[in-house]
Amino acid sequence: MSSIAAHSAGDILRSISDIKSLDLFCSIAKGNMESEILKETKGLTRKQYYSRTRQLLKTGLIKRSKGRYYLTCLGAIVYHAQLVIQTGVNNYWKLKAIDSIQSSAEIGEHERTKLIKTIMDDSRIESILVAQR
């Protein structure tokens, strides 16, 4: 059994749960980064840097080769899921408006879909909301 098989979604989410770990993870995702550049630009102590990268490596989100960090395939999936979450957060008030309209009136499925497509301007969020019900 590989070491990654023992990790749960909770382990993975915990490894990016604080803002500095998430920032480090996103920086690696945006371009394979050299260790020295990451250490200098993220404002982490040496211990903080190494404990966070060790956790990201341990959960299988990143890998290191020739002094550079890269996302693994699992890391790419987690990064894209995080982007969807961030899009949801950025559209919080639009989502609240949809919730409010849905709860204040009985609307049919067609009207609900039309409402979502009118208010939302992100196709990923639209497809998630249309599929929900």
Language-model region placement:
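Conserved segment of winged-helix/HTH DNA-binding domains
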Residues: 73-103
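Pre-recognition alpha-helix immediately N-terminal to the DNA-recognition helix
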Residues: 22-26, 77
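A short acidic, leucine-rich amphipathic alpha-helix
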Residues: 36-41
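Short capping segments at the starts of secondary-structure elements
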Residues: 19, 30-34
